[in-house]
Structure formats: structure tokens, C-alpha cells
């Protein structure tokens, strides 16, 4: 199951984004304001997407990305100047102010990409040589 976790310092922002995603038919498993809480939610699902801002109460988005399993992607919502130079793998950026249309399209694109990766991993595990 692909879970979506929304992490913003401002609880109202997190709730608003959760509501937008829920109206779009996406399953949001958690809304929180710290990276530690996001890690707790991440432990409850196999893979997912973390939607977050540049800074949480206890860590930066790059630290959270390092702590997340490889099966998780991150959607960073921040002004363009806050993004790193794109060196961190697994992070998609969306510049503020965001439009609902852009948010929904980006999330759908990320979910489809994750589904393709999951199917590919499943197919590879079935085609493994039993002698390995």
C-alpha cells in the first residue's frame, strides 16, 4: 500500500494539503509537524510519498530524506531558492505558491512511477534464478 504523509511546521498548512489530496481520492495516512512523527508513519507502510516543506520542527527535508527508506519518495513544497541543486535522489520539488492542479498532477505522476517500480521489482523477484 502506498501511503501519503503530509509534514509541515504549520498544522493548518498540513491539514489544507491533506484535504486537497483526500478530495482528489488519495489516501493520506498521516499529518504531522516533525520529522520524527513522519518516520513513525513511514514505519507503518511499505512505501509512500512524504509531502513536506523545507523545514520541520526537528529537522530539514534533506535529513528526513536520508532517514526514509528507499521505497519512499518526497515531494518538497518550497520556494525555488530553498531547493538544493538537485543532488538528492528521491525528491521532487514543487515551487510555492502552489496550484491545486499542479499538486494533483505531480502526486499522480509520483504514484504512477512508484507503481511501475513496484511491479518491476515484483517481476524481477519472480524471475530470479532459484540457484541464487
What does each of the following model-derived ranges do?
Residues 7-8, 32, 50:
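Conserved sequence signature across two-component system core domains
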Residues 114-132:
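CheY-like receiver
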Amino acid at each position: 500500500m502506498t501511503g501519503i504523509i503530509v509534514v509541515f511546521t504549520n498544522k493548518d498548512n498540513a491539514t489544507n494539503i491533506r484535504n486537497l489530496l483526500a478530495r482528489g481520492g488519495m489516501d493520506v495516512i498521516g499529518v504531522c509537524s516533525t520529522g520524527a512523527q513522519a518516520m513513525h508513519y513511514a514505519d507503518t507502510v511499505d512505501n509512500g510519498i512524504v509531502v513536506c516543506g523545507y523545514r520541520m520542527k526537528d529537522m530539514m527535508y534533506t535529513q528526513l530524506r536520508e532517514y526514509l527508506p528507499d521505497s519512499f519518495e518526497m515531494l518538497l513544497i518550497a520556494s525555488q531558492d530553498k531547493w538544493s541543486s538537485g543532488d538528492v535522489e528521491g525528491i521532487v520539488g514543487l515551487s510555492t505558491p502552489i496550484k491545486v492542479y499542479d499538486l494533483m498532477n505531480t502526486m499522480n505522476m509520483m504514484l504512477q512511477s512508484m507503481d511501475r517500480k513496484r511491479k518491476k521489482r515484483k517481476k524481477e523477484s519472480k524471475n530470479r534464478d532459484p540457484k541464487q
